[in-house]
């Protein structure tokens, strides 16, 4: 960089007490802009950034920029030509400052110490909200350039520094929303500005997500719907995150590297599809961040906006489902997360959305749209009366069949919890065997998905336990008889689930293969529930002792008539002994849980004594069990 030459060319601007005193005819203006362009290009070199910081040039540029923007914003006496000239100067100075602070903390500190906080918060924020320079909008390209470079300046200032981002966030978030709103219907005419602006908004929302207006949430959903319709069915290469360098009149910017490496100026054609995919990813992330993190959002009296938001999200999912595009899985999951978090808000009853969701379920084959609809419906059921009312609008059979279309693990969340809320003793009695078979198949497929997505485990376990609890024992027996793999699926779900299944099968008094019984006992005596490493609770011990008691009382299921043939004596006597020893220690406990377990243990002990009383030859383990049983009396 020929620093002296650049400094000489900028002397009229730098030495003037006010930039208003600087001649601004075309010749002079062209000269200033040319010198600043040279300076901006030279600041690609890190050593030149150090020079402008240490020599005070950066400090002077900040002063000039603040003066120029202050005149543009507040001086009503200047002509439109002078105003345009000052905006031209401001644009180039913004570009120079943006490039000077790339990967240079010293220059960032200079910017802050020289009054840069007001510059960034107020003046640059004002540029982002600039709608026009002249009433005939003849300077739209200048506005676009100013805003693009302002976004770059803010991004390069914040990148990699959480403290700076937190300080700027409250002042910049609003202007960024305004910037995006003005481009909603023309974003393809200024793609870099919109993509980088939405990316910066992502960073801002990570640290400042509270108190966003409901209307802004609706705007994001609208924008997402519009972009979704523009995404083409085409595989695209992902762009990487990075800082940016402000661009010149004839150059656009693309990523130069990875991580925190900066944009450099390159000549490259805009790729409309890259823009759509990048913007879709950024805006879906923005919306998800807000609705997932801000627990203070209040949708009271905003029912129509909420309905419109959910409709926009569902329509976006329907539109995107059949398309192949970059980051599709991430985007689709974020959109159903948005719908789910909006519906899960405690101030949202979700009643007005029921018709939308039912229509989606009955007419759409989009698995992600169906997943969103199921989540919303699930959150609309808060009581038994809600469940009854919903089942008047859509049948269990229809909901179960929808579940067979789900594939992505995240799609199952609403389905699992909704079915758990709706199933009861009455409606399962009339459940068609075909629907029941489908339900077990869905749950088994979902169980396989829990290997990759642990959050589904508790939801699936709750539904499986509810299903086994409310189904008639004959239907459970028939289902297992027609599909023996159901037993292995149940057994894999742990002690409590296996206890519930065993209780129902024992009540049915129909014979089952010994292999099925063994699978359930193996699971019960693992003393562990799916996804839980800790020891069983009092509640689990109660269920185990209840199941053991039922089995010993009526062991005709496998024709066990004496200790030699009884499977608990033959294969699980050590486990049975351990349980009774544990429960015997509850003898003096006064809490209801311990008392219930002890009563079950006493019942088991009585049956054991009855079984062994006529047996002449007991093994040492059976003798120990007999002595333990007597201790209960």
Curated annotation (Swiss-Prot):
Which GO terms fall under biological process for this protein?
A: establishment of cell polarity; regulation of cell wall organization or biogenesis; response to pheromone; Rho protein signal transduction
Q: Name one GO cellular component term.
A: cytoplasm
**InterPro entries, per this entry?**
RAP1GDS1 (IPR040144)
Q: How does gene deletion manifest?
A: Cell polarity defects; delocalized actin patches and abnormal budding. Cell lysis at high temperature.
**Keywords, ordered alphabetically:** Cytoplasm, Guanine-nucleotide releasing factor, Nucleus, Pheromone response
Which GO terms fall under molecular function for this chain's record?
A: guanyl-nucleotide exchange factor activity
Its subcellular locations are: Nucleus; Cytoplasm
| Principal localisation | nucleus
Q: Which PANTHER family match?
A: RAP1 GTPASE-GDP DISSOCIATION STIMULATOR 1 (PTHR10957)
Q: What does this protein do?
A: Probably acts as a GEF (guanine nucleotide exchange factor) for the Rho family of small GTP-binding proteins (G proteins) that stimulates the dissociation of GDP to enable subsequent binding of GTP. May also chaperone the processing and/or trafficking of small GTPases independently of GEF activity. Involved in the control of polarized cell growth via CDC42-mediated signaling. Involved in the control of cell-wall organization via RHO1-mediated signaling. May also function via RHO2 and RHO4.
What extra comment accompanies this record?
Present with 6330 molecules/cell in log phase SD medium.
- Complex and partners: Interacts with CDC42; the interaction is direct. Interacts with RHO1; the interaction is direct. Interacts with RHO2. Interacts with RHO4. Interacts with CDC11.
Q: State what protein this is by name.
A: GTPase-GDP dissociation stimulator BEM4
From which lineage does this chain's organism come? Eukaryota, Fungi, Dikarya, Ascomycota, Saccharomycotina
């Amino acid at each position: 960089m020929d620093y002296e030459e650049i400094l000489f060319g900028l002397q009229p601007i730098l030495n003037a007490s006010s930039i208003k005193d600087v001649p601004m005819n075309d010749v002079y203006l062209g000269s200033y802009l040319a010198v600043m362009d040279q300076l901006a290009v030279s600041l690609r070199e890190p050593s030149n950034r150090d020079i402008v910081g240490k020599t005070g040039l950066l400090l002077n540029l900040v002063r000039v920029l603040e003066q120029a923007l202050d005149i543009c914003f507040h001086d009503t006496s200047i002509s439109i030509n002078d105003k345009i000239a000052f905006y031209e100067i401001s644009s180039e100075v913004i570009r120079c400052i943006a490039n000077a602070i790339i990967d240079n903390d010293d220059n960032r500190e200079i910017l802050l110490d020289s009054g840069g906080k007001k510059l960034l918060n107020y003046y640059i924020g004002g540029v982002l909200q600039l709608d026009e320079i002249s009433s005939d909008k003849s300077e739209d390209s200048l506005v676009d350039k100013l805003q693009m470079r302002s976004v770059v300046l803010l991004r390069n200032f914040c990148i990699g520094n959480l403290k700076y981002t937190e300080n700027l966030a409250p002042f910049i978030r609003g202007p960024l929303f305004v910037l995006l709103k003005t481009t909603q219907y023309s974003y393809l005419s200024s793609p870099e500005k919109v993509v980088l602006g939405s990316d910066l908004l992502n960073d801002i929302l990570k640290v400042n997500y509270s108190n966003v207006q409901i209307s802004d949430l609706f705007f994001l959903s609208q924008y997402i719907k519009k972009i979704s319709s523009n995404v083409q069915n085409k595989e695209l290469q992902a762009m990487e995150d990075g800082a940016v360098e402000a661009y010149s009149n004839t150059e656009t910017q693309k990523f130069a590297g990875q991580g925190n490496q900066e944009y450099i100026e390159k000549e490259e054609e805009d790729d409309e599809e890259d823009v759509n995919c990048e913007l879709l990813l950024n805006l879906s992330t923005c919306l998800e961040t807000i609705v997932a993190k801000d627990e203070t959002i209040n949708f009271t009296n905003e029912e129509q906006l909420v309905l419109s938001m959910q409709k926009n999200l569902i329509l976006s999912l329907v539109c995107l489902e059949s398309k192949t595009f970059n980051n599709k899985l991430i985007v689709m999951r974020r959109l159903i997360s948005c719908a789910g978090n909006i519906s899960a808000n405690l101030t949202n009853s979700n009643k007005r959305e029921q018709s939308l969701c039912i229509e989606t379920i009955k007419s759409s084959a989009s698995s992600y749209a169906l997943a969103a609809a199921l989540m919303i419906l699930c959150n609309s059921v808060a009581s038994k009366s809600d469940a009854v009312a919903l089942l008047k609008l859509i049948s269990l059979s229809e909901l179960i069949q929808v579940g067979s279309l789900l594939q992505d693990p995240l799609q199952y969340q609403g389905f699992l919890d909704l079915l758990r809320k709706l199933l009861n003793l009455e409606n399962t009695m009339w459940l068609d065997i075909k629907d029941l078979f489908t339900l077990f198949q869905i749950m088994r497929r979902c169980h396989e998905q829990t290997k990759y997505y642990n959050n589904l485990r508790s939801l699936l376990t709750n539904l499986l336990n509810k299903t086994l609890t409310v189904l008639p024992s004959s239907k459970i027996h028939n289902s297992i008889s027609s599909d023996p793999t159901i037993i292995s699926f149940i057994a894999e779900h742990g002690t409590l689930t296996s206890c519930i299944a065993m209780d129902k099968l024992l009540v049915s008094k129909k014979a089952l293969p010994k292999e099925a019984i063994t699978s359930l006992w193996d699971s019960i005596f693992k003393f562990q529930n799916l996804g839980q490493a800790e020891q069983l609770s009092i509640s689990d011990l109660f269920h185990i002792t209840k199941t053991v008691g039922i089995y010993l009382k009526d062991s005709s299921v496998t024709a066990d008539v004496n200790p030699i043939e009884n499977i608990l004596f033959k294969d699980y006597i050590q486990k049975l002994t351990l349980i009774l020893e544990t429960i015997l220690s509850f003898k003096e406990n006064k809490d209801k849980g311990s008392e219930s377990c002890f009563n079950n243990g006493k019942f088991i002990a009585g049956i054991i004594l009855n079984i062994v009383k006529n047996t002449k030859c007991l093994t040492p383990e059976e003798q120990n069990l007999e002595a333990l049983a007597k201790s209960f009396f």
